[in-house]
């Protein structure tokens, strides 16, 4: 084997080793820097159900025995973000309250972003923990619910908007139809810093 060829082979082997090492380092850094998204759980009667943490859960509107399943999980507060089909909302309210579950409706359009008063109400519920286990839902569990969970992640857990949007997409957020929601999430850190209605939630973090 010529000296030049041996040198070339050595350089290739060295470059490969460096590339593999860098790739492993990048994966390790991603594992450290990327927070865990909500754990998806199979709950009868509720699609796209996710456990955000020990006191906060998300999903689509409960169907069938869905509310009873929430009771079994220890959920004592339901936050309903639907603003449409008032009859369905009232039916769910009656079912929840008959089981001793607190029911709160923060009505909004499936095409609109959240307003400050709704976010403040939701954040106030979070502050009440550990006395409460909260389930938040909209119609399908991806858009409005994802937006509120993103707000929680940013305000209480220090996530970046990009990380929060990534979690939204993992729960079927329809960006094509609702790009305004992702834009709202991206602007949220600055909005939290300047909104008078959200002043008491600045630099807040959930306790472990």
Model-identified regions with their sequence ranges:
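Bacterial N-terminal signal peptides that target proteins for export
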Residues: 1-10
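Cys-dependent protein tyrosine phosphatase-like superfamily
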Residues: 14-134, 147-208
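Glycine/aspartate-rich loop-and-adjacent alpha/beta segment that forms the canonical ThDP
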Residues: 144
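Short cysteine clusters
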Residues: 138
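Substrate/cofactor-recognition hotspot
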Residues: 141
């Amino acid at each position: 084997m010529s000296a030049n060829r041996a040198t070339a082979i050595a350089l290739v082997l060295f470059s490969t080793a460096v590339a593999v090492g860098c790739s492993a380092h990048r994966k390790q850094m991603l594992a450290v820097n990327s927070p865990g998204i909500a754990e998806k759980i199979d709950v009868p009667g509720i699609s796209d159900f996710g456990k955000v943490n020990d006191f906060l859960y998300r999903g689509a509107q409960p169907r069938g025995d869905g509310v009873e399943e929430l009771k079994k999980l220890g959920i004592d507060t339901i936050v309903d973000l639907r603003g449409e089909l008032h009859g369905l909302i009232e039916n769910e309210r009656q079912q929840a309250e008959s089981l001793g579950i607190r029911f709160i409706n923060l009505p909004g359009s499936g095409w609109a972003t959240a307003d400050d008063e709704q976010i403040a109400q939701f954040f106030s519920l979070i502050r009440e923990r550990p006395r409460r286990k909260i389930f938040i839902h909209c119609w399908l569990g991806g858009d409005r619910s994802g937006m509120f969970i993103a707000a929680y992640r940013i305000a209480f857990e220090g996530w970046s908007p990009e990380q929060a949007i990534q979690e939204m997409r993992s729960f079927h957020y329809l960006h094509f139809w609702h790009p305004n929601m992702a834009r709202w999430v991206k602007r949220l850190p600055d909005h939290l810093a300047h909104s008078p209605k959200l002043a008491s939630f600045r630099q807040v973090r959930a306790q472990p």
